[in-house]
Amino acid sequence: VAFAVTAAALSLAPAGSASAHDFLIGSSPAANSVQATPLSEVTLTFNDIVLNIGGSSSIVQVTDASGAHFETGCATTLDRTVSVPTALGRPGTYTVTYQVVSADGHTVSSTFTFDYQPPPGTTAAAGFAASRCGHAG
């Protein structure tokens, strides 16, 4: 009887976020923003918990117009937040490309850009030909 009541209650409940993919609700720097100071990390915040499968299921890459990579380590995941350490190069437009595993187990990926306009005299990192974590892209 208890099972039947529980099953009936669940069948009346609206489909919630458990069946929907996670989505980005914020980032630092923000999409389409101008970053005027040196940046030590890029942080992405999602609407639900991002799964951390084996410690390598979240990928975040930060590249410039030439395709050079400016992430200095691998992405880390904590609840709804994914971060990657960075050291940016010359002023210009940077692209953040991410792939995470949503709370429902599906992969979610997208990109956004921001402009980097540091003060004159700021040291520019050289960047890398490939991701520091061995991910293609």
Language-model features, listed with the residues they occupy:
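Extracellular Ig-like/FN3 beta-sandwich strand-entry sites
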Residues: 39, 91-93
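Short, surface-exposed alpha-helix to beta-strand junction/turn motifs within ectodomains of secreted
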Residues: 40-73
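Secretory targeting and sorting signals
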Residues: 1-20
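N-terminal edge beta-strand
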Residues: 19-38
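Extracytoplasmic/periplasmic copper-protein system
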Residues: 17-25, 107-137
